[in-house]
Amino acid sequence: MPTGCKPPRIYPRGLSGRQVLSQNRTHVRFICISMSATRSPRTAHTSAPTRRQASGRTLQKGQQTKAAIIDAALGLATHIGLEGLSIGALAEVTGMSKSGVFAHFGSREELQISVVREYHQRFEQEVFYPALDEPRGLPRLRAMFAYWMKRSSVEIDSGCIYISGAIEFDEQPGPVRDALADSVREWLAAMRRAIVQCQEMGQLHAQTDPDQMLFEIHGLILALHYEARFLRKEGSIERALASFDHILRRAGAQFDAAT
């Protein structure tokens, strides 16, 4: 071959140089597409957890924000009542926009119901569950009333949503009133069960009417709030505790007054 001359290109039989070049380009495109398709599942696999984690963080932040709003709303409701709650007032207290507060509830009514549920949950944690640590019978019944009184003594200054809500929604049928009534019924039913357990264990007279006894005990709490909060009478808590012991003794309970 002469120096400086390029070797002749040899193409497959029946194909021109242009056709071979076209085929090569097709092969290159096919290889690129194949490699991209092979990598895409791996990319999707690694990005999916990232999206889930981001979604989880967003959900957690939203729940924390909603809990903070409910906490602020509960603080307001104990002083101005459930009817005094408004999206605008909460937006001002929390430093959020009205639309931001509204987005977590959708309506003022749903906000009020959320506050009732939060109040009931805290009531259970402070009154009902601690009393369950006591043995069944008189120890548990007395513990339930003692924790109830303890919470009531704090609420003399702040207010009890069960009591104020009953006045606000007495003649307003609807979901908020239902949520309030259901919460009160649930607690009173727990008190009634404790009374019946005392009877079953022989610590109270069998002929004692549990509903009558529950009525009188509940009446003590209502009287305490009226006299201590509205009339500002001193000694109201002591009289309520003494009256509770009288109710138990009248029903046949035997215990040391100092316990």
Question: Which role fits each region the language model picked out?
Answer:
Residues V28-I80, G84-V93, E110-I113:
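Basic, helix-initiating cap at the start of DNA-binding domains
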Residues G4, P8-G56, A143-K150, R185-M201, ...:
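C-terminal peripheral helix-coil segments that are non-catalytic and often amphipathic
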Residues R140, V154-P175:
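Amphipathic alpha-helical segments used for helix-helix packing
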Residues S99:
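Key DNA-contact positions within bacterial/archaeal DNA-binding proteins
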Residues Q63-D71, T78, E83-G84, G95, ...:
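An amphipathic alpha-helix adjacent to DNA-recognition modules
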Residues D178-S183, E200-E216, G235, R239:
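All-alpha amphipathic helical-bundle segments outside canonical DNA-binding/catalytic cores
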Residues S114, V127-S158, P210-I217:
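Hydrophobic alpha-helical connector segments
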Residues A72-A73, T94, C198, L214:
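Small-residue (primarily alanine) positions within well-ordered alpha-helices
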